[in-house]
């Protein structure tokens, strides 16, 4: 029996909010630009550029994410912050930038983007309904003004006119640290239906 991606993300987020299991030691995933379909990699930033469009994806740490949420959404409490007593957070965060360089519109659907693990688990970026429902499932009150999180995350269809750009966060719940590899698939659609996409690949660093 297969479950909807949104339902899987909701359950995972609820566990992250409530009492996600802490791995014995830190697990590090390094970018792997050697895979077919990978974007261009510079540091932690993946990208794909053309005369018509550009897409950028940057993995960010907890401090950077919290600062971005505070600046964009005006929330003092980051809803994705590390649970007290845990050394690492229950979420993965990426900054995404989409730019339309063409003379026609560009459509970007965040829910069509995916995180996929080597275990063939899939999840879409978290949206506001999933975040709110997760707090309810964890029997925790949602932060005051949580609806303003939409100012920080890319939530819902984005339509860019010529020359426009949009940026925001993709937030995914953390997966089992036994996973060996994962990838983020990012795609936009140009007016004539042409796809514009790349993948960001990561592999677990071997312990010495």
What is the predicted function of each stretch?
Residues 19-208:
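Conserved functional micro-motifs across diverse proteins
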Residues 1-4:
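Positively charged n-region of N-terminal signal peptides that target proteins for export
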Residues 6-16:
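Bacterial N-terminal signal peptides
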């Amino acid at each position: 029996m297969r479950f909807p991606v949104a339902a899987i993300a909701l359950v995972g987020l609820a566990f992250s909010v409530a009492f996600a299991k802490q791995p014995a030691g830190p697990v590090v995933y390094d970018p792997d630009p050697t895979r077919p379909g990978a974007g261009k990699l510079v540091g932690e930033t993946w990208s794909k550029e053309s005369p018509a469009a550009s897409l950028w994806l940057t993995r960010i740490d907890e401090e950077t994410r919290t600062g971005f949420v505070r600046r964009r959404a005006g929330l003092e409490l980051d809803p994705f912050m590390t649970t007290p007593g845990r050394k690492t957070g229950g979420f993965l965060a990426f900054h995404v930038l989409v730019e339309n360089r063409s003379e026609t519109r560009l459509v970007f659907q965040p829910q069509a983007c995916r995180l996929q693990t080597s275990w063939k688990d899939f999840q879409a970026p978290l949206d506001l309904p999933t975040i709110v429902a997760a707090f309810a499932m964890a029997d925790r009150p949602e932060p005051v003004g949580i609806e303003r999180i939409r100012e920080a995350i890319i939530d819902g269809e984005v339509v860019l006119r010529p020359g426009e750009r949009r940026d925001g966060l993709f937030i995914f719940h953390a997966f089992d640290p036994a996973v060996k590899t994962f990838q983020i698939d990012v795609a936009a659609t140009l007016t004539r239906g042409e796809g514009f996409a790349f993948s960001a690949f990561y592999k677990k660093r071997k312990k010495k």
